[in-house]
C-alpha cells in the first residue's frame, strides 16, 4: 500500500510540473571585460557580462516548474561552471543549466527549474550575471554563416526572450583593427567538445587568384587535426570582424592528416577569397602552436610565399552569480471585482523581506469547450466568498475537406482555404501528373538487390531498374547404380537457387561406432566424395551428463566435455565470458534523464536503458536526385540536437578531385543549398610516395610534399639541418693517416675518425726521492713524439763528474695547461781522504786529498688544466762525487744545434690537435739553439808520472755553452674566419763559464824520470748551497666585442741578469756578496696591463787550485827535486734566485674579426764575474794562482776558473707534449747530458748514470 501511495504521489508531482515564462523580466546591463589582452572590444571576444533581472512568484510558480531563456547569437558561456542558482537572501529558488550553442545552434539557452524553497506565499526577485561570448562567425558552417550577420560595428540591440517576454539592451561593438586585405586567422574554444575551431583566410587578390596553397599544421605533436570536421570554400564578403558571411564551392585538391591540412587551388574569380577551417584537438587548448602555409599567386602578379607561425593562448573564465530579496505575500479574498495590493513598511537597506497583502476577488475556474462553428462565446456561473466561480469559454473550430488535383509542376503543393463565414475549410492538394513507367531487371556483381527509379521530365517515361545479385547455387551429390558420373544444372528464376545435381557411382564402406546425446541408437552413412570411402557411423546413447557453467577472463566461451567410461557420468564444463552490454537510449516526456540496467543470464546481453528528455531540433535543407521534395527527421543522441532534413531537387554540379587513404576511388556528391551549386567530390587512392632526405643550411627541419597527378608518384622532400660533428683521433698499425666520416641519421652527431700512424718515442730517465721506479708515457698529438719518462730511485754510488759541466731542461707541456715548477738543492757533505802512491823514480810521494759531495735535487711540478683539477709531480735526482785514481775520464759529445717548431689547435675540451687549413690557430712556437763544447777529463794526475809541469799551462780550459729559446704564440680567433696575428715571446739566455780541465793521460809506454818530492797533503773542501729560479710564462688573449680588429700592444721587456762575486784565501766559506737585479717592464699600450719584475741575487766564491800536468805519451821528462806544500783548496758556491713571471696577453675577437697580437719580447742575459786569490803561481790559461787577482765580466769569450752555481728552470707552455727542449744553464751539482739514439730521438741522462756508463765502458 505504501509503495502505491509513493508512486501515486510521484506521478502527481510530475504531472503537476509545468513550463512558465516571463521570469527574466529586465536586461539591466551588458559590459565587456578583456579576458586575454584583446586589441579591441569585439562581440566574439570574452567576456561580455550580461546582468539580467528575474522574479519568481510563489502563487504562479511551483517547485519543479521550468522556464527557459533563449539568447540568440550567443556562442557560449565563458565559465567553467555548468549551472547558476537564482538566489535571494542566500536561498536558492531556482537552478539554471548552461547550454552553449557553439557550432550546433545559432543561440544559447539557460534552462531553469524552480526549487522547493519557493512557497506560495513567497515572491523572490533579483539579478543574475551571465559571462558570455557572442557568435559573429568564424567558420564555414551554416551556424556561423547565419550568425555572422547578427551584428555590425557600432550600436546594436541585443535581445533575449523568456517565452513571449523579450528583454533588450543597446550595446556598442568595436570593429576589428586587423587589415582585412591581409591574411586572416582566428581560433575559438568549444568547451563542450574540448576542441578548437581554427580559421585561415587567404590574402586578398582584387583580380582573383591564378593558383595557391594554404593550410596549417603542427610539428610538435601536441595538436591533432579532425579531418572529418573541416570547411573549405570561397567567400564573397567579410563582416566587420573579418569572418566569412558566405561560402561557395570551388575546385581544389585537399590533403589532410592528423598533423595538418593543406589545399591547392586554381582560378578563383575576382571578388572571392578562399578560406579553410577545421576542428583541432590540442594537448592544452589554452596553449598550442600552428604553422601556416601561405603561398598564392594573384591574377596578373608574381607568386608570393609568406608562411608564418602563431602561438595561441587561452582566455580567463568568469563566474556567474545571482542575488536578490524575498517578498512574502499574504492573500485575503474580498467581493470586489478587481485585485488590490497593500505593501507593509519596508526599508531595503535593512530588511531582506518585503510583505505584500493582496486583496483578490472570488477565484474563478475557466472551462474551455469547443464546437463546430465560427464565433467564441463566454458564460459565467457566480459563487459566494469561499467558493469558486466558473467561466465557460466555447471556442469554435472548423472542419476541412480535401480536394486533390494533378498539375504540370514537378512538386506537390498543399493549400488551405479558410472559410470566414462557414465552419468547413478546403484543403487543395496539387500533385504532379505521373509519367508512365518501364521496369528493367538485370543482374550485377554485388551481393544485394537494388531498385533505382530514373524520373523523366513531366510527359516522359520513368524507368525502374531492378538489379539482382546472381542466384545462389546448391550442389547435390548422389549415388546411382551406374558406373559413371553425371552433372545436371537446374536453373531457378532470379532470386531463387540454382541446383547442380552430381550423380556418382557407389563408394566402398567403413563402419564406426560412437556415442551421442540421444537416448536411442542410430546408424548414419557418411558418403565420401566419388572415389572415396563411405563411412557408416553407429551412434549409441551417451552417459549421463553433469553440466557446470562458470565465468572466466577470456572474451570468448568454451565448452569442454570430459567423457567417462561407458556407464559413468560425463562432465560438460561451460566457460562463459562476461556478458556484453547493449545501451539503448530513448526519449520520454520528463525533463530529466534516468539510467536503468537490466541484467541478462550468462551468455546473454545486459541492457542499459537511458531515458533522456527530448532534444532541440535543427532543420537542414539539402538536395537529392529526385524532382520532388521530402522531409526526414534524424534523431540525435540524448542532449543532442535532432535534425530535420528537407531534400530538394538537385543543383548544378562542380567536380573536385582529392586523395584519401583507401586503395580504391569513390565519388561523393556534396549538395549545396537550394539555388546554389553541388560539389562532386572524387576521392582517388593516394599516389605512391618517394621520400628524399637532404641537408640544408638552416637550423630547423622542414618537410615538403610535391603532389603528382592521380596514378603517379608524390615526392616528400625532407630538409634536415646539418648534424653536429665529433672528431676522434686514434692510432693504428699502418704507416699512413686516414680520415673517415661516419654520417649519423638527421638530428644525430656525425663522427670524423682520424687514424694516425704511431708516434716516435723519446725515453727520458730521471731520478727522484722515492725508493721505487715508475714509468710514465706522455702521448703527444698525431705527428708528434711520445715521451716515456722513467723515474729511478737515488743511488749511493760514487760517480765522477765535473761540477762545471751542467745542463738544465726547459720542461715542455701543451697548452692550455699552466705549470709551476720548484727546484730545491739540498747538499750533504761527506769528506774522506786518500793517499795515492805515484811512481816517479823517486822515494817521494805525491799525495791527493779528495772531498766527496753528495747533492740531492728535488723538483715539484704542479699542472692545472683550465682552472679545474691540478696535479702535482715531484722528482729528485743527482749524486756528485770527485773521481779517485781508479776512475776514468768522462767525455761529453758536442750536441749539435736543435731547432723545433710546432703549432697546435686548442679545442674547447682542452685537447690539443694539429691545425689544418682555414682553422684558427693558437699555440707556442719554440726554437732552441744549443751549442756545447766538448769537455775532456783525465784520471788523477797523481796516478801517473808527469814529464813536464809546463805542459799544463797549454791545455785548453774553457767550456762554453749558449742557449736561446724563442716562444711564438699564434692568436686565437674564436669566431672569425681569419688567423689572428701572433704573439711572440723571446727569451735569450747567454751563459759564460770557465772550466779547468785536467791534463792528458800519459800513455803506458812513457818513460818517466823524477826527482824525489816531498808532498804535504792539505784538505780540500767543496761546499755548495743552491736555490732555484722559477720562471712562469703565461699567455692569454683579450677579447674584442664586435668582431673588429683589436688594437695591438707591443711591450718589449728586457731581462738582464748579472752576477758579481769575489773570494779570498782568508775566508773560504763566505765571500763578499753583491746582488744583481733583473727587471721586466713592458711599455704600456692600450690593452696592456702587464708589469713583471725579476730579481736574481747570486754570490759565488770559488778558490780553485790548478793541478799538475801529466806527461804525454812518448815524452822523456826529467824533473828536479821539489819540496812542495800543497795549499788547501776551498770551493764555495752560494746561489740565491727569485721567481720570474712573464705574461703575454693576446686579443680575442668574439665575432669573427682579426685580432692583432701583443708582442712581448724578453731578453735574458746571464753573465758571471769573479775574483779569486790563492797561494799559488799564476797560470796564463785563465786559472787564478799565486795570489794575483783576475776578474771576468759579462763576456762570453773570457774564461776564469770560477763556477757559476745559478740553476734556472723555465716553465714555458709549448704546443706539443712530444717536443723536448734542452738548454744549458749554470748548475752547481747536477749534470744532465743529452745524446742522440740514432733515430732523431734525444735521450737524457743524469750525471751519475752517464759517468757510470763511461766507467763501465773502460773496463769492457
UniProtKB/Swiss-Prot annotation:
GO biological process: biological process involved in symbiotic interaction; cell-cell adhesion; hyphal growth
Cell compartments where the protein resides: Cell membrane; Secreted, Cell wall
Disulfide bonds: 73-150, 96-112, 205-298, 227-256
Species in which this protein is naturally found: Candida albicans (Yeast)
Composition bias type Polar residues, residue spans: 896-918, 964-979, 1002-1062, 1073-1090, 1111-1154
Keywords associated with the record: Cell adhesion, Cell membrane, Cell wall, Disulfide bond, Glycoprotein, GPI-anchor, Lipoprotein, Membrane, Repeat, Secreted, Signal, Virulence
Main location: membrane
Functional summary from the UniProt entry: Major cell surface adhesion protein which mediates both yeast-to-host tissue adherence and yeast aggregation. Acts as a downstream effector of the EFG1 regulatory pathway. Required for rapamycin-induced aggregation of C.albicans. Binds glycans and mediates adherence to endothelial and epithelial cells, thereby playing an important role in the pathogenesis of C.albicans infections.
Protein name: Agglutinin-like protein 1
